[in-house]
Amino acid sequence: MATPKVGNKAPVFKGICTGMGSVDLSKLKGKKVVLYFYPKDSTPGCTTEGQNFRDLYKAFKKEGALIFGLSRESLKSHENFKSKQSFPFELISDPDEKICNQYDVIKEKSMYGRKYMGIDRSTFLIDEKGKLVQEWRKVKVTGHAQEVLDTIKAMK
């Protein structure tokens, strides 16, 4: 799968998610979309990242932006994670990695000398016309949600 390019149309997807049941990117035209990919529910870095987006949610909403978190975890796992952390946004479940592959976020990783394929923490900003306007790869959690918000504010 080719890596999506900033300036081009964002890869369109349909997926299952918390709350709404399903999400179809093509039906979200007219809204800015923040799509953040994270490795695993209820782990320290992923929890902090979600909390940071949660804490800035009202500011994102004021800018007309929807936030979606996405990982390979099950919908049940996402529902528990969302509830426990009081996330006001939806989490997309991608167990077959279809959306992950469209956005080219599955990468070889290493932990304790063991190599495996996993989600490379990444965020994509999609404008109201469905165009990919910014991407962040190999995201460091600290300050990231604020950086995404600042980028949206600068789009005006």
Predicted feature residues:
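Chalcogenol-based redox active-site neighborhoods
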Residues: 1-156
